[in-house]
Curated annotation (Swiss-Prot):
Listed name of the protein: Tetraspanin-7
Positions in the Cytoplasmic compartment: 1-16, 76-86, 235-249
Subcellular location, principal: membrane
Membrane protein topology class: Multi-pass membrane protein
Highest taxon of the lineage: Eukaryota
Localisation: Membrane
Gene source species: Mus musculus (Mouse)
Keywords from the named record: Glycoprotein, Membrane, Transmembrane, Transmembrane helix
Length: 249
């Protein structure tokens, strides 16, 4: 029995070293997921506010998952150093839950990436029709038009069918140079053509969102499958320690 323990001790030490390294990398991925989630919310938040509410889950899932991973990454290091079989099993169980959560995040990002065009066309058109220049959705429209240098859905003439145009003309956020735009110019589509951005926001926004949601989904899928390695290491180490009644000092 003693000789068997001596033979398995190097294996356990090797598994312990690998799992500590993995747990540290796991902790780093948690920080990355948290950062990507916050970045997605802050960078894409204005654009997402124009989309249906059920499409806003991916950044929050990443933030929540990233925060939890940071905590359990530290727990994994502690469990490995202690050499506690039940802690290692709990760690492996958590990794399996993280694996499923990240798959959900990745799938939601992938689905959102392919559904965005129809959803954005409908909601952005609705936001233009109800534009008043003051509410949250109106400010979101202004932000999109200013930041992407675009105007309207397909082009600036789309504004002529909105109630806002009758009283105020095209919104100043469409102007190439707002100091060079005046209300009279914005009421006249012919004159406005020389003052406002010509490109519509639809193609620019959908391209921007598809690219960045693809990044979020790709990161989630990549990190999710890395959890399988940690699950295998934690289960193997727990099994070796239990079978050989090995205690780490």
């Amino acid at each position: 029995m003693a000789s068997r323990r001596m033979e398995t001790k190097p294996v356990i030490t090797c598994l312990k070293t690998l799992l500590i390294i993995y747990s540290f990398v796991f902790w780093i991925t948690g920080v990355i997921l948290l950062a990507v989630g916050v970045w997605g919310k802050l960078t894409l938040g204005t654009y997402i506010s124009l989309i249906a509410e059920n499409s806003t889950n991916a950044p929050y899932v990443l933030i929540g998952t990233g925060t939890t991973i940071v905590v359990f990454g530290l727990f994994g290091c502690f469990a490995t150093c202690r050499g506690s079989p039940w802690m290692l099993k709990l760690y492996a169980m958590f990794l399996s839950l993280v694996f499923l959560a990240e798959l959900v995040a990745g799938i939601s990002g992938f689905v959102f990436r392919h559904e965005i065009k129809d959803t954005f066309l409908r909601t952005y058109t609705d936001a233009m029709q109800n534009y008043n220049g003051n509410d949250e959705r109106s400010r979101a429209v202004d932000h999109v038009q200013r930041s992407l240098s675009c105007c309207g859905v397909q082009n600036y003439t789309n504004w002529s069918s909105s109630p806002y145009f009758l009283d105020h003309g095209i919104p100043p956020s469409c102007c190439m140079n707002e100091t060079d735009c005046n209300p009279l110019d914005l009421h006249n589509l012919t004159v406005a053509a020389t003052k406002v951005n010509q490109k519509g926001c639809y193609d620019l926004v959908t391209s921007f969102m598809e690219t960045n949601m693809g990044i979020i989904a790709g990161v989630a899928f990549g990190i999710a499958f890395s959890q399988l390695i940690g699950m295998l290491l934690a289960c193997c180490l727990s099994r070796f320690i239990t079978a050989n009644q090995y205690e780490m000092v």
